[in-house]
Amino acid sequence: MKVMCRVILMVAAVALLAISMPVHASKMDDRIESSARKSYVFETYLKTDDIKIQSVNGVVSLTGTVSEESHKSLARETVASLPGVKSVDNRLEVKGDHPAEYSDAWLKMKVKTTLLFHRSVNGLKTEVNDVKDGIVTLQGEATSKAQKDLTTEYAKDVEGVKGVKNEMTVAVAKTSSTVGQNIDDASVTAQVKMMLLYHRSTSALNTSVTTEKGVVTLAGKAKNATEKDLATKLVNDVNGVKSVKNLMTIE
C-alpha cells in the first residue's frame, strides 16, 4: 500500500511539472517578444520595418521585411542578446534590390548607419547624399567644428571608404544627445557589435560583447595596445554605453 502511494505521488508530481513547464515557457516567450518590440533598436532604427517576432521555448523566429541589410543584422543581434533567448532564426527579407558589397550604395548605407550609432555626432542631421568611387560627401548640420571633424573621422574609418568630403554646416544644437539616456542592454550590445564590424580599425577584431546596466564588457584578442584602446574609445561613444570594461588580451 505504501509503495502504491509513493507511485501515485510521483506520477502526480511529474504531471504537475509537465503542466507548469509550458506555462513558464509561455511567460518567458511573451517576455522575450515584448522586450524585443520595446527595445531601443526596434523603436528607433526598425520602427518602419515590418518585423514579426515569435518565441517558442527561447527559440526566436524573425519574419517579415526590412528596408536595409543592416536592419536585418540589427534585429538579429538585438534579439540574440535578450535574456532567455537560445537561438534566432532570422528569416527577414530585405525589400528592393540588394546593393553589391563595397558598391557606392552599400557604402552609403554603412556610413549612415555607423554615424547613427555614435552619440557624439549628429547622425540624424548628417546627410550622406553622395558616394562615388568610394568617396563620401557629407552634408547637413553639426553642432560644432569639433563634431564636424569627428564625423569626418568616423566616416573615413568605415570599411571600404576611400575618402570623405565634409560639406556640413555648423549650427547651434537643437536636440539633446543620448548621454545619460537609459537604453536596454540588448540594444547597446547590438549597436556595439555592428559598430565594431563597420569600422575599418576594428572590423577584424575577434571580440565578444556583453552589456549589463549599460556597462559594456569586451573580451577577445587585439593585435596591440593601440587597437585595444581604439576599441574602448569607439565603444564608449555608442548610444547607451555608460562605461567600458576592456578585457581583451594582446596577441
What function would you assign to each model-found segment?
Residues 2-251:
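N-terminal targeting leaders
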